[in-house]
Amino acid sequence: MKEQKKVFIKTLGCQMNEYDSQKMHEVLDEHFHTVKTDDYKEADIILINTCSIREKAQEKVFHELGRWKNLKKKKEDLVIGVGGCVASQEGENIIKRAPFVDLVFGPQTIHRLPEMIKRKQSTQESQVDISFPEVEKFDFLPEPKAEGAKAYVSIMEGCDKYCSYCVVPYTRGPEVNRPFEDVLGECAALAEQGVKEITLLGQNVNHYLGPMENGETADLALLIHFIAEIDGIERIRFTTSHPVEFSQNLIDAYGSVPELANHLHLPVQHGSDRVLINMKRNHTILEFKQKIRKLRAIRPDITISSDFIVGFPGETEEDFQKLMDLVKDVNFDQSFSFIYSKRPGTPAADLPDDTPMEVKKDRLKRLQDLLNSNAQIISRQMVGTEQRILVEGTSKKDDNVLAGRTENNRIVNFIGDKSLIGQFAMVKITESLPNSLRGELI
């Protein structure tokens, strides 16, 4: 029997990249009957799925590639590939700088990986494909394979927003929506394999407008209603959203679809209208807060997390204070916050930026201290409550302790039988820790 080829994939960045990496494994397994490995030194195929959101993303990629260069000398048949958003940005330049790289492919050409590998092996020439072939990617991917009780499902690709600081429209292309019935089919197939929680993915997921077989168009709210009807699906999440397209239909879904989790990640980026204008976010803080008020009127217990950028070009202390005021007003839960990172080719990269880095670091610390304080208060308020936990596995620190997540996305560790893994369990929260909760099985 021929030995199976081993595949190692290093994933950087967002949940969309995690989804794409899973699809890479599936498409390679379908064509070459491969197996996963966590040790790149024993792999026959090494891929890095890259992210270009932060500064120096390219350098991180080439640093990683440098670690693999010597492996190529020892194993001539080793295939090394670079995928994701840095691949889209750099293209042929990756081969010029690292000639030992065999494949460069974008997020939309994952389905062509087997073909690219075969061409490389037959021609001995590096292969580059960073095109944007509409929804072809989804048409040629194999049937989804569940890994546990949770799964990601991509419902759209790309972004048309062109926020002034962001590279995503340039690296993932324009918005392309998967057909409504295709998404439902993937969710149903995952449910049959035991998946209980679905996270719908898209760069601007709440702008989903999926074509339907009857000629009509489905928005995200309608899609969520139909997914909730699939037998076995008990919890639905979605990410990442934009406030502009956070529609009344979607807000209403929180009142009519109990499967929709009571946690929302809604990036606002800043609390100053002046900064939002320079970011080209196309909404005001008042409009954002109005949507939050409507949402909480329908689902009072919902927790809301967000993304924040401090130190954007031209940000003043007054602007920053408005951001802090917004965090207090909305009472954001655990959130992501970063110092502005200049991305080449974006409009914001040309804006004058005279704020000292020490000031930016100080603002980031003040913001993170406030966000952490909010999150700890929310966690402490959960002590004594009973929570429905989706048990995902065992604790990273103790294999005898189970771990899962609450509906509002808190990690909970508790003692229980391993037969509960992949199931929902009711747990009473007994203790709040900085990064997790402890509980007792009811």
From Swiss-Prot:
Keywords, sorted A to Z: 4Fe-4S, Cytoplasm, Iron, Iron-sulfur, Metal-binding, S-adenosyl-L-methionine, Transferase, tRNA processing
Domain Radical SAM core: 145-378
Keyword Cytoplasm: yes
Cofactor notes: Binds 2 [4Fe-4S] clusters. One cluster is coordinated with 3 cysteines and an exchangeable S-adenosyl-L-methionine.
EC top class, as a word: transferase
Repeat keyword on record: no
Binding site for [4Fe-4S] cluster 2: C159, C163, C166
SMART domains: Elp3 (SM00729)
Cofactor(s) in the UniProt record: [4Fe-4S] cluster
Entry EC no(s): 2.8.4.3
Main location: cytoplasm
GO cellular component: cytosol
CDD domains listed in its UniProt record: Radical_SAM
Location of the TRAM domain: 380-442
GO MF annotation list: 4 iron, 4 sulfur cluster binding; metal ion binding; N6-isopentenyladenosine methylthiotransferase activity
Binding of [4Fe-4S] cluster 1, residues: C14, C51, C85
Segments forming domain MTTase N-terminal: 5-122
InterPro entries, per the entry: Elp3/MiaA/NifB-like_rSAM (IPR006638), Methylthiotransferase (IPR005839), Methylthiotransferase_CS (IPR020612), Methylthiotransferase_N (IPR013848), Methylthiotransferase_N_sf (IPR038135), MiaB_methiolase (IPR006463), rSAM (IPR007197), rSAM_horseshoe (IPR023404)
Annotated localization: Cytoplasm
Pfam family for this entry, one: UPF0004
Reactions catalysed, as given in the entry: N(6)-dimethylallyladenosine(37) in tRNA + (sulfur carrier)-SH + AH2 + 2 S-adenosyl-L-methionine = 2-methylsulfanyl-N(6)-dimethylallyladenosine(37) in tRNA + (sulfur carrier)-H + 5'-deoxyadenosine + L-methionine + A + S-adenosyl-L-homocysteine + 2 H(+)
Family: Belongs to the methylthiotransferase family. MiaB subfamily.
Function, as annotated: Catalyzes the methylthiolation of N6-(dimethylallyl)adenosine (i(6)A), leading to the formation of 2-methylthio-N6-(dimethylallyl)adenosine (ms(2)i(6)A) at position 37 in tRNAs that read codons beginning with uridine.
Subunit structure comment from the entry: Monomer.
Name of the featured protein: tRNA-2-methylthio-N(6)-dimethylallyladenosine synthase
